[in-house]
Amino acid sequence: MKLTVLVGGVGGARFLLGAQRLLGLGQFATPDDNARHELTAVVNIGDDAWIHGLRICPDLDTCMYTLGGGVDPQRGWGHRDETWHAKEELARYGVQPDWFQLGDRDLATHLVRTQMLRAGYPLAQITTALCDRWQPGATLLPVSNDRCETHVVVTDPTDQQQRAIHFQEWWVRYRAELPTHSFVFIGTETASATTEVTAAIADADVVMLAPSNPVVSIGAILAVPGIRAALRATRAPIIGYSPIIAGKPVRGMADACLSVIGVDTTAEAVGRHYGARAATGVLDYWLVAEGDQAEIDSVTVRSIPLLMSDPEATAQMVRAGLELAGVTV
């Protein structure tokens, strides 16, 4: 089976780990299972930024480190056994920004990526090269080789004027607490999805939307030209998972993002935001948490346990989605 999943960072990486657990891939691989299934992740690049002259791709790296067995288990991002000497030395020099953490081991990834970008390699090819070191057991594809950054229009606290700041500054520095007016996906007017991404969607037996942030992760992927058309054209069933349980995001600040675009923080509202593929949206099936309800025209909804407490629990989420769509592993 070919499974293609649209993902963000920490939550998306954990969802992929559960898919690997179910399919027997990556660190859960067996010789028989490894030949029968393929897992491809279409990864958000809206969080990508230039920091200290280096190109940072947080969601790609989180997926790569998690599936490769090297992620910090407490934070859910960055390197295991990380040290922070470079960050401390930069602070002594007074270098800005001082609110974004880059660990010493993590810097190696960003140095390699930046060198390859400056040598003319596209991001997809660079990601493949980085994955050669980590062996994630899945194909990780940036949604585009082009610049597609999420920026946020806020009220500047210094002069009360509206201005756009990078998503990382809004999310990490200000913790989404500034008066916020809109999200802008910079570069999408000229960007396009890679041919590898559209092929992964077209050739899939099943497509899933991970329970990642519906605005700045999945939403940023959907904003890239070519993605919605590919999803609407694929013959594969499209199964989405709610990131909202009992009116609250499982992690992160999805509620802050949803309020900016006028969507309620409920499983039903997020499902309606994605919409039915039978109309103008992208969903065929929608999984919500036990105790939550959702009615979405032309979308089949089921309630299941949705907490990704460990790979086995997440594997059962993936299995439930496949069963709902009538797909047998």
UniProtKB/Swiss-Prot annotation:
EC identifiers of the protein: 2.7.8.28
Cofactor requirement: Mg(2+)
Residues bound to 7,8-didemethyl-8-hydroxy-5-deazariboflavin: 61
SUPFAM superfamilies named in the record: CofD-like
Superkingdom as given in the UniProt entry: Bacteria
EC top class, as a word: transferase
Catalytic reactions of this protein: enolpyruvoyl-2-diphospho-5'-guanosine + 7,8-didemethyl-8-hydroxy-5-deazariboflavin = dehydro coenzyme F420-0 + GMP + H(+)
Gene Ontology process terms (BP): F420-0 metabolic process
Signal peptide range in chain numbering: none
PANTHER family in the record: 2-PHOSPHO-L-LACTATE TRANSFERASE (PTHR43007:SF1)
Similarity remark: Belongs to the CofD family.
NCBIfam families from the UniProt entry: F420_cofD
Subunit annotation: Homodimer.
Free-text function comment from the UniProt entry: Catalyzes the transfer of the phosphoenolpyruvate moiety from enoylpyruvoyl-2-diphospho-5'-guanosine (EPPG) to 7,8-didemethyl-8-hydroxy-5-deazariboflavin (FO) with the formation of dehydro coenzyme F420-0 and GMP.
Official protein name in the record: Phosphoenolpyruvate transferase
Source species of the chain: Mycobacterium marinum (strain ATCC BAA-535 / M)
